[in-house]
Amino acid sequence: MDLVSNLPARIHGILDEGAKGDASRIAFTDEHGVDWSYRRLIDAVELAAIEMSRLGIRPGDRVMIVCENSIAAIVLLYASSRLDAWAVIINARRSQHELDLIERDCRPRRVFYTHAISSDADAHACRRDADIEPFTGIGEVKVGKLDADSVAERVHRDSSRQVAVVIYTTGTTGRPKGVMLSHRSLAFVACRGKRTDTIRSDDVSLCVMPISHSYGL
């Protein structure tokens, strides 16, 4: 079986693959030690996508997620995928100056802050006068003002051309630079372990690296 031709077209499809056979299996254990089944996670992602759409997020929009590792960040990431929006994942511990540079560079439609689990994210949200929005399943998230002038990118059916995530590096100059990662590239890395039998369905992986870093993601 060819790995590439059988990859999910979008990264949220990885959850659907994981749910096959037994959707009650644990997908994630969150920052509070609560287990999330694939079914519960998929449902939360679907609802978050509806709520993000209500907040004006369109296919092709850049969605900036200022976060630390948490179930809220994971759900917002996969919800962005469902909407064909680009998730720009930013470590909340970055400086105010860096966040301002990144926001000016990527021109997100909105910025989402996981303030409930990160005092740094909350500080950035307060500085931007973000509003609290309730999200079914993950609780409250602070959301920045809508940028009505933000222009959506073209959406590609081809997963190798459609951007899933933008990661900002520190860069050799100290100025953050965006790296665009396609759905296919992320799905390939995620599914390769299954293909090579190096990762099995009953394995547990501890995510120590921030998901705003390519390795943690």
Please identify what each model-predicted range represents:
Residues D35-R39, A164-F188:
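Conserved AMP-binding A3 loop
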Residues Y78-L83, D105, H213:
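Short hydrophobic alpha-helices that are characteristic scaffold elements of the AMP-binding
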Residues L77, R94-A123, V141, L146, ...:
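Conserved ATP-dependent adenylate/AMP-binding module captured primarily in the ANL superfamily
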Residues L7, S24-I57, D61-S70, I74-Y78, ...:
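Conserved AMP-binding/adenylate-forming core of the ANL superfamily
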Residues L3-A27:
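A short N-terminal helical cap/helix-turn-helix that marks the beginning
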Residues A116-S160:
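ANL superfamily adenylate-forming
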Residues I42-L47, V179-R200, S205-M209, Y215:
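Conserved structural elements of the adenylate-forming
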Residues P8-A9, A23-S24, D147-Y168, R175, ...:
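Conserved pre-ATP/AMP-binding loop-to-beta segment of ANL
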